[in-house]
């Protein structure tokens, strides 16, 4: 329901071109956070290419994006002149270096469309040349050993890739076959397909011999079927695919396939995951000549989030372990070994599966890094010793004191983050934010101007719990909310608030609650279970799991969590549906959602608001036209922030 890149109100993926003139009223332009979406190190370690830009107030993703190449030695910056200019939706992406490091290829979206081009440029910004115009989406570029480019592409795409994107209009033949994302090889200005036409390929990696690929794929609707994806090998010659691993447990999703440097083994992450792109689980390896997969991190109290093979053909995992982001070396991948911690810190590296870019044989790595109090920068280093390459966000700060806290709930050790205003005068109102997912974790990230900063400046303490169902404590913890949505995780959250009140001057009579996606559901659910909270704000929530099952565009994610469809076991859905307990609500609740949200349809928010209004509970609702799962238009993100702050001010001050 909510991905690693979806923090409730913070998601900002696309916007209309008209939004280019929108300036945030609550933040000066020079205080906006400059974010690095993709970082790619050249094979010789001399240059770092990055997709980056300033994010709007209260949003994570820049609406105007740049492609920049920096010298690792000097930090000298070259901005590539994009053919479509410096405007919204003229988005570069997927930078990929040629093996001789003489060329950088990248994709470029055509503003106002779902069509992309592929360009190549020299490191100094010269020799920009178009390789292809493509009627559809293109991403995940890789150079093959013969110098050709591979990619993931959807011919005739009707929307951007991903369920968080605004859905296409629900009209016409709903049974029509959806367009599939396939592996393509760019040959003489045309795309040669290297995967079957009836499979949607989610992620892939090259085999070093150039003869094919390994990837995760599933037939049918790509938004809906990732939860049943299998691991395939694909032939570069004829595009055929062969299943090499099919999960036997519905609670095992697959992510981050990475082929070893010698081509003998594929490593991947497997575990219970609620969203494509929000990765966490155990690390498995599988011999490509045949055999059974091996879990090489069984019972590890951590969640692997990304993988890569180092220059010595050893497997490295970026993992979340409690309140630490870590790089750990897992050996050759043939068997479970004691993990060697290469780096550990209370900060966050990179963005998902592209968290680390590696140059061999030097072993130099490049990434972006940030924390609650340190803004994003590009960093390079070896052995986990980082040195910032950029200073673009120097001077930005967060007006908060940050503390990681732990508590015991039902035998689980649960972790969360407590942020206090810099200046405390008496007892503080506390706002708890429940993250999306539920398979996700709220990790240290620099928010900049937006809701978090505004609330801190107004004297609110903020609490970010990672209850059962979250990443960071191992697979048993992540799966602990199966068939139990809203019950055990709510107990964890309430116990966490008790723990926060023991270490900070929190006023228990002034508690607020908010969250988006699964966090929006938890907000709607919580106010039906307790009157402890005096104000609530629900973003893109779920009020009725039974009706939600037939309304949303990704119902396949629910089977691993509920154990059966709503038609086979309606009771397990009913016991976690806020609407069935709606007469208990006394908490004033504001709710908002995007009109074209296919993950948490607007009807769910409307149903909840309608009930509260009929019952005389103070409520308000806002449905933002044209928006998907998370707000994109800066005017809408700012409006939601203003309404949220006013709501908490009204009932908690």
Regions found by a protein language model. Give the residues of each.
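Beta-propeller fold detector
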Residues: 78-82, 129-133, 192-195, 242-246, ...
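Bacterial N-terminal signal peptides
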Residues: 10-21
């Amino acid at each position: 329901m909510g991905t690693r890149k979806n923090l409730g109100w913070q998601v900002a993926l696309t916007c209309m071109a008209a939004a280019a003139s929108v300036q945030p009223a609550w933040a000066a332009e020079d205080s906006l956070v400059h974010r690095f979406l993709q970082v790619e190190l050249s094979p010789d370690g001399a240059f770092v290419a990055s997709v980056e830009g300033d994010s709007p107030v209260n949003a994570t993703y820049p609406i105007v994006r740049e492609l920049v190449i920096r010298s690792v030695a000097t930090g000298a910056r070259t901005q590539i002149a994009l053919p479509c200019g410096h405007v919204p939706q003229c988005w570069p992406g997927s930078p990929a270096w040629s093996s001789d490091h003489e060329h950088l290829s990248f994709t470029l979206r055509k503003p106002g469309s779902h069509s992309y081009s592929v360009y190549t440029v020299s490191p100094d910004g010269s020799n920009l040349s178009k390789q292809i115009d493509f009627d559809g989406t293109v991403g995940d570029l890789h150079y093959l050993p013969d110098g050709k480019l591979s990619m993931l592409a959807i011919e005739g795409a009707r929307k951007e890739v991903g369920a968080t994107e605004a859905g296409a209009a629900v009209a016409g033949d709903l049974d029509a076959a959806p367009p599939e994302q396939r592996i393509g090889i760019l040959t003489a200005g045309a795309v040669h397909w290297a995967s079957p036409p009836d499979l949607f390929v989610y992620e892939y990696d090259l085999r070093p011999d150039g003869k094919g690929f390994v990837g995760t794929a599933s037939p049918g609707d790509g938004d809906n079927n990732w939860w049943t994806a299998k691991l395939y090998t694909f032939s570069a010659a004829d595009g055929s695919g062969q299943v090499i691993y099919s999960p036997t447990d519905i609670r095992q999703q697959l992510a981050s396939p990475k082929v070893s440097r010698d081509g003998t083994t594929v490593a991947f992450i497997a575990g219970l995951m609620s969203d494509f792109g929000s990765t966490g689980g155990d690390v498995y390896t599988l011999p490509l000549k045949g055999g059974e997969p091996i879990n090489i991190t069984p019972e590890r109290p951590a969640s692997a989030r990304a993988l890569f093979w180092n220059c010595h053909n050893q497997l490295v995992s970026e993992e979340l372990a409690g309140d630490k982001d870590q790089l750990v070396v897992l050996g050759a991948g043939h068997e479970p070994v004691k993990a060697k911690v290469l780096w550990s810190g209370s900060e966050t590296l990179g963005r998902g599966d592209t968290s680390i870019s590696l140059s061999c044989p030097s072993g130099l790595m490049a990434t972006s890094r940030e924390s609650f109090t340190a803004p994003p920068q590009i960093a390079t280093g070896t052995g986990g010793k980082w040195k910032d390459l950029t200073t673009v966000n120097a001077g930005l700060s967060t007006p908060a004191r940050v503390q990681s806290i732990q508590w015991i709930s039902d035998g689980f050790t649960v972790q969360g983050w407590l942020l206090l205003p810099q200046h405390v005068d008496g007892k503080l109102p506390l706002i708890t934010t429940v993250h999306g997912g539920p398979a996700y974790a709220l990790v240290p990230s620099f928010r900049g101007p937006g809701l978090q900063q505004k609330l801190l400046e107004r004297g609110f303490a903020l609490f970010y719990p990672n209850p059962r169902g979250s990443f960071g404590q191992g697979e048993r913890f992540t799966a602990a909310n199966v068939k139990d949505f809203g019950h055990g995780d709510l107990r964890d959250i309430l116990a966490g608030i008790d723990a926060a009140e023991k270490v900070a001057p929190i006023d228990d009579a002034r508690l607020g609650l908010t969250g988006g996606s699964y966090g929006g559901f938890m907000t709607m659910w919580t106010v039906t279970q307790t009157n402890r909270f005096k104000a609530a704000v629900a973003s893109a929530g779920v009020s009725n799991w039974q009706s939600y099952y037939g309304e949303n565009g990704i119902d396949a994610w629910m089977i691993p969590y509920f154990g059966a469809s709503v038609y086979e076991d309606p009771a397990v859905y009913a016991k976690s549906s806020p609407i069935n307990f709606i007469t208990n609500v006394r908490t004033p609740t504001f709710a908002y959602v995007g009109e074209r949200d296919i993950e948490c349809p607007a009807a769910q928010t409307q149903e909840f608001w309608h009930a509260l209004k009929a019952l005389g509970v103070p409520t308000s609702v806002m449905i933002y036209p044209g928006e998907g799962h998370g707000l994109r238009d800066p005017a809408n993100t700012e409006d939601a922030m203003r309404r949220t702050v006013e709501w908490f001010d009204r009932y908690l001050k």
